[in-house]
């Protein structure tokens, strides 16, 4: 090992000594300085050897190396923005209010024009729903008739309770919409029904009185034959005692017994008739009560039906009035009328057709962008956004700036694009500046391109990423 180290030492020492000796005589080894004209008369091989090399190529090489070093340093230090590009449009934060009819209707009158400012509640369009006027008239007529019917049965109910017909007053305010013919008809029906009920009661009352008179007559016969039976009974006892004393013949005893039996039979017959009449009286009295009960029950049932019918008709009238009210379309908010689509009086509009759009006056202009699925993982609320309006070239009119306000949590399907996420962008201003210095106001619906700053990366990383990707993928095995 020592021999090896000694050999290496001697080797470097020899070169060191040689370099030192050459360094001492270095000036003697240089060629003498000659002028340019002296060098030109030297032989060619001496001219080539002694003429100094031009410094320009060396300087260019140094400059190239310096440029490469500076470029590498700048590429490593400098940062570029990572941008996700998303198409979209300008909108208002409160969402413009679309004005639509609730059903098919005819345009009766238009009160606004495109670009007009309207206040909340201001009438915009007057429509006539197909068949609404006829429905209202029909319902009002049915309701007036239902009120009369209710009054009819309420009056009859009062008459039943008081046993007398009250004054029929059909001139009250609630009946003002009823025709004179209907009022007279209801009055006649009330009087006719009350009279019929009274006649039925009178007939049953007379029948009851007749039965009562018959009862009194039969009762008198019963009393008569009860007395006759007692007398004949006493006679029979006396005849029987005389017969036992042999003071009376058997034929006379049998004759008296026959009279007693006849009196008893007559008494039984009249008592049976009396019981029958008492049952008849109970039946007649019950029928008399049932006449009133049935009549009252029928009146109450009809009154209940007509009260329910009136309630349903009131609801129907309210619904029809709401239909009429809905056909008078008013502004839901204060704002500006845009995209007015109806201009013809008498024209027909269909259900859910957009008639116009109201842009709220205090609305804030925003942008909505559709972020591609491949970029959504890097987009977050609060990130800076540059918005370029397609209508105005950004190189001449500039661009808008803003920040991500909200990102939808769920993707939506877009034709020819696939799944995208809707992002709302709050912008700093709602106008651009033209080359001549004029302010240009922007409006909802303008197409934009949003460039969302998702981060930064070095230029070197940007330049090497394709190479890195190629190398990484090329080293994979199938």
UniProtKB/Swiss-Prot annotation:
Periplasmic compartment segments: 81-478
Domain of life: Bacteria
Annotated compartments: Cell inner membrane
Residue spans crossing the bilayer: 60-80
Keywords: Cell inner membrane, Cell membrane, Cytolysis, Hemolysis, Membrane, Transmembrane, Transmembrane helix, Transport
UniProt topological domain (Cytoplasmic) ranges: 1-59
Gene Ontology CC entries for this record: plasma membrane
Keyword Protein biosynthesis carried by entry: no
Pfam families on file: HlyD_3 (PF13437)
Main location as per UniProt: membrane
Membrane topology: Single-pass membrane protein
Nucleotide-binding recorded as keyword: no
GO BP terms, alphabetized: killing of cells of another organism; protein secretion; transmembrane transport
Functional summary from the UniProt entry: Involved in the transport of the Leukotoxin.
Similarity remark: Belongs to the membrane fusion protein (MFP) (TC 8.A.1) family.
Protein name stated in the entry: Leukotoxin secretion protein D
């Amino acid at each position: 090992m020592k021999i090896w180290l000694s050999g290496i030492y001697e080797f470097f020492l020899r070169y060191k000594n040689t370099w030192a000796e050459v360094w001492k005589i270095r000036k003697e080894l240089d060629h003498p300085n000659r002028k340019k004209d002296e060098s030109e008369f030297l032989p060619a091989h001496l001219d080539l050897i002694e003429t100094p090399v031009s410094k320009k190529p060396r300087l260019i090489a140094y400059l190239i190396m310096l440029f490469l070093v500076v470029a590498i340093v700048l590429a490593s230090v400098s940062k570029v923005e990572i941008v996700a590009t998303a198409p979209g449009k300008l909108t208002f934060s409160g969402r413009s209010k679309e004005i639509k009819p609730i059903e098919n209707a005819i345009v009766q009158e238009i009160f606004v024009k495109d670009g007009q400012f309207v206040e909340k509640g201001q009438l915009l369009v007057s429509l006539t729903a197909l068949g609404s006027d006829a429905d209202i008239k029909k319902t009002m007529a049915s309701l007036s008739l239902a009120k009369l019917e209710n009054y009819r049965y309420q009056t009859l109910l009062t008459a039943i309770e008081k046993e007398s017909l009250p004054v029929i007053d059909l001139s009250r305010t609630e009946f003002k919409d009823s025709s004179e013919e209907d009022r007279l008809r209801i009055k006649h029906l009330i009087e006719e029904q009350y009279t019929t009920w009274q006649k039925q009661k009178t007939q049953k009352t007379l029948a009851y009185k007749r039965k009562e008179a018959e009862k009194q007559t039969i009762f008198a016969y019963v009393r008569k034959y009860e007395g006759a039976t007692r007398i004949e009974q006493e006679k029979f006892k006396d005849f029987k005692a005389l017969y036992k004393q042999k003071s009376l013949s058997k034929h006379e005893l049998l004759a008296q017994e026959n009279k007693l039996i006849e009196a008893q039979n007559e008494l039984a017959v009249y008592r049976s008739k009396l019981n029958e009449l008492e049952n008849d009286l109970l039946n007649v009295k019950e029928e008399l009560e049932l006449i009133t009960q049935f009549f009252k029950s029928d009146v109450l049932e009809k009154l209940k039906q007509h009260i329910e019918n009136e309630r349903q008709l009131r609801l129907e009238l309210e619904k029809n009035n709401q239909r009429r009210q809905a056909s008078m379309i008013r502004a839901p908010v204060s704002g500006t009328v845009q995209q007015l689509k109806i201009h013809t009086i008498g024209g027909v509009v269909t259900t859910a057709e957009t008639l116009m759009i109201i842009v709220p006056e205090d609305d804030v202009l925003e942008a909505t962008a559709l972020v591609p699925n491949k970029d959504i993982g890097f987009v977050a609320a609060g990130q800076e956004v540059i918005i370029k309006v397609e209508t105005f070239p950004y190189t001449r009119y500039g661009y808008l700036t803003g920040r991500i306000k909200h990102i939808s949590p769920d993707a939506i399907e877009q034709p020819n694009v696939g799944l995208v996420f809707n992002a709302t962008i709050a912008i700093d201003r709602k106008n651009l500046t033209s080359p001549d210095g004029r302010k240009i106001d922007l409006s909802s619906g303008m197409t934009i391109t949003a460039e969302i700053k998702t981060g930064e990366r070095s230029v070197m990383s940007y330049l090497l990423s394709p190479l890195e990707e190629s190398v990484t993928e090329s080293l994979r095995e199938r």
